Amino acid sequence: MKIFPAIDIKDKKCVRLVKGDFDNKTEYEMSPVEQASKYKDHGFKNLHIVDLDGALTGETVNLDIIKDIVCKFDLKVEVGGGIRNLESIQKYSDAGADKIILGSAAIKDKKFLKKACEKFLNKIALGLDAKNGYLSVSGWKENSNQLTL
């Protein structure tokens, strides 16, 4: 089994949202880079990073922080959060991310998912959320019409 400790980044800080609610969050003292260092020091080899600013804007807002983490530490890094176009996938790939996680955009736009998989075959992972038996999108705010099974 592979364990991926997580770092959620909002406003350049490590945070934890309560049930995906951006208005209900805990902010931590440690910076994302310091937290990644701590995980590395504890022997973790993998890291899951979510750019929560990116999830809101659809942009690679915290790309510099993520690139810094990838460059400083020998960790397998997977990145998600608002990745809605091939350009964003390319930026994270160029930054050294091992996997790029697609969520809502992959469910809502099958053509995008197909193009992403064709161009970045070994880099794409799906992050799928479910609620009441249906795939959930847009930060748990909407249910799709797609059953989970």
Q: Where are the regions that the model predicts?
A:
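Short, acidic/polar
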Residues: 28-40, 84-90, 142-149
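Conserved, mostly hydrophobic/aromatic
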Residues: 8, 39, 47, 79, ...
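Conserved anion-binding
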Residues: 12-15, 19-23, 93, 97-149
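Alpha-helix-loop-beta-strand connector modules within alpha/beta enzyme cores
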Residues: 5, 56-80, 111-129
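Catalytic domains of carbohydrate-active enzymes, especially glycoside hydrolases
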Residues: 35-50, 95
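Glycine-rich beta-strand-to-loop/alpha-helix junction loops that act as flexible
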Residues: 52, 78-83, 102-104
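Glycine-rich, proline-tolerant flexible connector loops at the mouths of alpha/beta enzymes
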Residues: 46-64, 104
